[in-house]
Structure formats: C-alpha cells, structure tokens
C-alpha cells in the first residue's frame, strides 16, 4: 500500500545522514544505508552510449532535476560525485557507438536473450521471485496495514498479499517458471526487531529538532505518535531493515530474472477500528525512477541509481509492467490511479497505468521489478470482495457478478507475464 499523502516528518527520515554510530561522520547515507562501493561501477565501463545515458538520467531517473555537481554528462564520459566533502568523482566512460558497447554485467536475463519456449510454457526456464508486500499477522497493526469494520474480519494487507502470491506461484509454475518466494510466511526476513532501533530512533528524532522525544505512543489516534521513539523504531524495523534484508536475499541467494512485488492499495481510512469506506477504486504499477533532488544528495541512493541505470533493468521492467498493467486493467475494469501530485512520481510507458517512483525495493533489487498496486482495500467494492474471501466461479457482490479478488489478481498478473514473454522471447530457435 502506498500512502497517498506524504507525511513530511516521515519523508525527512529518508534525507537524513546516518548517525555516526552506524557510519563515519563523513558518510552521507540514507536510513540504514550502506557505504557505496563505487569501484563496482568499473564493470560498466563502455556499456552505454552518451545518448542512452542522458535519456535515462533526464527522462527516467532524475525527472525532478539534480544539482549540477552531482552528475556531469560530457561527450565521452559522465563525472559522478562520490563524496561531496572530498569532492571525489567517478568517471564513467561512454561507448562511442551502439555497436562498440561492452557486455552489460548482470545475473538476470532479458526476455530477448532467452530461447523460444513451448507455446504452453512461455515462462519456461525463467526464475521469478514473488515478494508479497508487508508482513501481516501479528505485525499488521504495527505496520498500520490493518483495519476492521465492526465485527467483520480484519483487513491486513500483508496477509492478503501472501495469499495472492501463493495463488500466483501455482499459475506461474504451470507456465514453466521456477518460482522463488522472498517471503512465504508472516515472519520478517530481518533478524532485527523494533527494540534494536530505539537508540537510532532517539538520535533521529533529536536530529529532527526534538531534544527530548517521548518514548511511547499514547494510543493509535495520538496525533504526535510519529514523534515518539517507539513509532520511529518500529518503522526502522518493518520498513527499512525488513526491505533491506529482502534485497540481500534477492541479490545474493535467489538471483531472479524478475521480481514481482504484490501490494494492495488504500486511501486514508482514519481510525482503523472505525475506518472510512470510500467509492474510489483504482489500479497502478510502479517502476524505479523519478528520484527527488534531496534523495540524489545521498551517496548510497545516487550510487544505487547509477548502478540500476547501467543494468538496463528499466527498459525490461517498463515493458513487462505495461503488459501486466493492460492485463490487470482488462480483468479488473479499474481506472488508472492519478497521483494528486507530480512531486514524487513520473508517468511512464504506454498503458497509462505505470509510474516511475523511487521506492526502496525497486531501487535495491538487482533485477527488473514489477510492482503491483491494484484495488483500494477500503473502497466499498474492494472491502466487500475481500470479505467475500476466495471462491470458485463468480459471486454477486454489490449487485455485480465478480470473481474472487484473489484469483482475479493472480490470474491477471500471470496472464500479463505470459503474454509479455511469449512475444518477447527469441523466435525460431
């Protein structure tokens, strides 16, 4: 689920330098970020032309602009600032023309590099990781991905996404894919827990102008809960530590050709014990990009952006996302979500349903990522369909015959992936 209104206090976390206890004072990193290994980019020398690099920087990754000393695009190379204090830079050489480009080092395989597959197995040989968003279970209330209407079954996003991922897995396997789970239970991937981040949370709050932060939240409706050590330490656990550990799993053990992140969307519901149900229901997908200027100031995010750009994940994930979005739109009949602001996103692709946005998982996962955000959980229709659970065939909900929302989700993603790879794989092998 994406928060439709960005909380400025929370957003400020992203722009903080790491506290000296976690990194040297000269490091300029995001929350729980790692010091960049700029030498890794040597592997990408001569793999991209000037025009390709300039296009991806200006039209995809840095659509909100950037400080001119961060990235200087010259005729034959780009100068990328690695440390503002020391003024050191990394020189990325461009290939002189498309024919002379060196091979791109990456573990994932683009569709066009795969041999043709059997008609009924368009995903044959493909490694697909499924990443059901959030945690659910006992963590759902902490994540603020929980609400309940009266005596009905609570709606918990992490449990919903896990249910969809298991259904999707069986469909992808039938289509020939090897399916890997980033998460297949309600247990966190990270070994850390909120208590491990209390001291860091306290320092972050002090750095943000709260010299004596409160230790605990008074109640769920506490208007100042985001200024408490408890709330911040919980966020450091479930948002930052958890997603970073998932990235380690994806990048060092699973090595997928594609990761599918499964979410349900929502709009502000107010009191989770007495939530507001709304008429709006919509769909959109996300790809990595559209970095904010403040985000680009952080050394680790700038490094991660350049590394991802050079891997060419964007071209692959956009094409896949457009195809999956079209499949999901046809199956669900949902309109495209329209962000209320363009300050954090950039609309991309041809389907009308895909946006570029700088989210942690698509930034860190070293492969193409399809990030799905269908259905508004607290819409009247979405809520009714979630309450109806899973079932065969169709059931009349709000006067309309509808499939199980879980099967509709899984089927439409599987059909979109099958269509993309069926058309994009090499022909005639």
Model-derived regions: residue spans:
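Catalytic-site microenvironment of enzymes
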Residues: 2-5, 9, 24-429
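Bacterial N-terminal signal peptides
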Residues: 10-21
């Amino acid at each position: 689920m994406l928060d439709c209104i960005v909380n400025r206090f929370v957003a400020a976390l992203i722009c903080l330098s790491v506290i000296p206890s976690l990194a040297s004072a000269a490091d300029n990193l995001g929350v729980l970020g790692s010091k960049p290994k700029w030498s890794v980019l040597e592997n990408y020398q001569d793999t991209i032309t000037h025009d390709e690099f300039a296009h991806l920087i200006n039209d995809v990754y840095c659509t909100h602009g950037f400080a001119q000393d961060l990235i200087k695009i010259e005729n034959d190379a780009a100068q990328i600032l690695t440390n503002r204090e020391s003024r050191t830079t990394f020189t990325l050489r461009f290939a002189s023309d498309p024919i002379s480009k060196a091979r791109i080092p990456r573990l994932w395989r683009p569709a066009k590099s795969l041999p043709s597959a059997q008609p009924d197995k368009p995903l044959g040989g493909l490694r697909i990781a499924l990443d059901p968003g959030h945690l659910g279970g006992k963590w759902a209330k902490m994540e603020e991905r929980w609400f309940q209407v009266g005596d009905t079954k609570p709606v918990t996003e992490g449990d919903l996404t896990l249910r969809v991922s298991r259904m999707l897995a069986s469909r992808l396997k039938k289509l020939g894919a090897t399916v890997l789970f980033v998460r297949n239970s309600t247990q966190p991937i990270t070994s850390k827990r909120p208590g491990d981040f209390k001291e860091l949370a306290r320092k972050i709050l002090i750095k943000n102008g709260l010299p004596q932060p409160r230790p605990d939240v008074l109640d769920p409706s506490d208007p100042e809960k985001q200024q408490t050590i408890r709330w911040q330490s919980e966020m450091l656990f479930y948002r930052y530590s958890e997603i970073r550990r998932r990235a380690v799993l994806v990048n060092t053990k699973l090595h997928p050709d594609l990761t599918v992140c499964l979410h349900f969307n929502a709009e502000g519901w107010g009191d989770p014990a007495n939530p507001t149900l709304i008429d709006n229901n919509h769909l959109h997908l996300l790809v990595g990009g559209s970095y904010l200027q403040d985000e680009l100031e952080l050394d680790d995010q700038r490094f991660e952006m350049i590394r991802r750009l050079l891997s060419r994940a964007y071209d692959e994930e956009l094409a896949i996302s457009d195809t999956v979005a079209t499949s999901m739109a046809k199956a669900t009949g949902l309109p495209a979500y329209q962000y209320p602001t363009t300050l954090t996103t950039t609309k991309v692709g041809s389907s009308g349903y895909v946006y570029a946005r700088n989210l942690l998982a698509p930034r860190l996962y070293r492969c193409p990522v399809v990030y799905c955000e269908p259905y508004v959980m607290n819409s009247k229709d979405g809520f009714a369909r979630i309450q109806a659970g899973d079932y065969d065939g169709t059931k009349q909900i709000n006067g309309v015959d509808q499939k199980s929302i879980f099967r509709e989700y899984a089927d439409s993603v599987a059909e979109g992936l099958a269509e993309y790879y069926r058309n994009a794989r090499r022909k005639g092998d």
